[in-house]
């Protein structure tokens, strides 16, 4: 795939700081302007239906944390873990997984708007609402190099598939 990544994509996140390292510490959400921050970089966006959910917590995101050095060695400048959860939940999720690197970002896709626009959202029962699907995207210099959505498991959106696609 060689499509241009959409312009004007903005997520919300809370930047990790040592002063706010405690999982209960609340930072202030700020915009993550994809165009501005990642224009000439290689970024992996890995989306999850929800922070602290079984597959996301046990099988999907921990391998990205464990293989972050390998991702950087393969040319990745940043990893963005994306969900429709609010930025406070995303921040706590990153802290719970022990992530402290500023290039490993836990961001919110409010209302799953970006994911919906890309055809990568899920409509779950009313108690859960619209969520981001489980997917991975590799964007390099503003061009989408890889997109894979999983309906079950993490075969296409997991770290091994992402590393193989780099």
From Swiss-Prot:
EC numbers, comma separated: 1.11.1.-
Gene Ontology biological process: cell redox homeostasis; cellular response to oxidative stress; hydrogen peroxide catabolic process
A UniProt-annotated Pfam family: Redoxin
GO CC term, one of those recorded: mitochondrion
Active-site residues, record numbering mapped to chain: 56 (cysteine sulfenic acid (-soh) intermediate)
UniProt keywords, alphabetically: Antioxidant, Disulfide bond, Oxidoreductase, Peroxidase, Redox-active center
Enzyme kind, highest EC tier: oxidoreductase
Highest taxon of the lineage: Eukaryota
Reaction catalysed by this enzyme: a hydroperoxide + [protein]-dithiol = [protein]-disulfide + an alcohol + H2O
A GO molecular-function descriptor: thioredoxin peroxidase activity
Ranges where the Thioredoxin domain occurs: 5-166
SUPFAM superfamilies attached to this UniProt entry: Thioredoxin-like
Miscellaneous section: The active site is a conserved redox-active cysteine residue, the peroxidatic cysteine (C(P)), which makes the nucleophilic attack on the peroxide substrate. The peroxide oxidizes the C(P)-SH to cysteine sulfenic acid (C(P)-SOH), which then reacts with another cysteine residue, the resolving cysteine (C(R)), to form a disulfide bridge. The disulfide is subsequently reduced by an appropriate electron donor to complete the catalytic cycle. In this typical 2-Cys Prx, C(R) is provided by the other dimeric subunit to form an intersubunit disulfide.
Assembly description: Homodimer; disulfide-linked, upon oxidation.
PANTHER family attached to this UniProt entry: PEROXIREDOXIN, PEROXIREDOXIN-5, MITOCHONDRIAL
Purpose of the protein: Thiol-specific peroxidase that catalyzes the reduction of hydrogen peroxide and organic hydroperoxides to water and alcohols, respectively. Plays a role in cell protection against oxidative stress by detoxifying peroxides and as sensor of hydrogen peroxide-mediated signaling events.
Family in the record: Belongs to the peroxiredoxin family. Prx5 subfamily.
Name of the protein this chain belongs to: Putative peroxisomal peroxiredoxin
Organism of derivation: Lipomyces kononenkoae
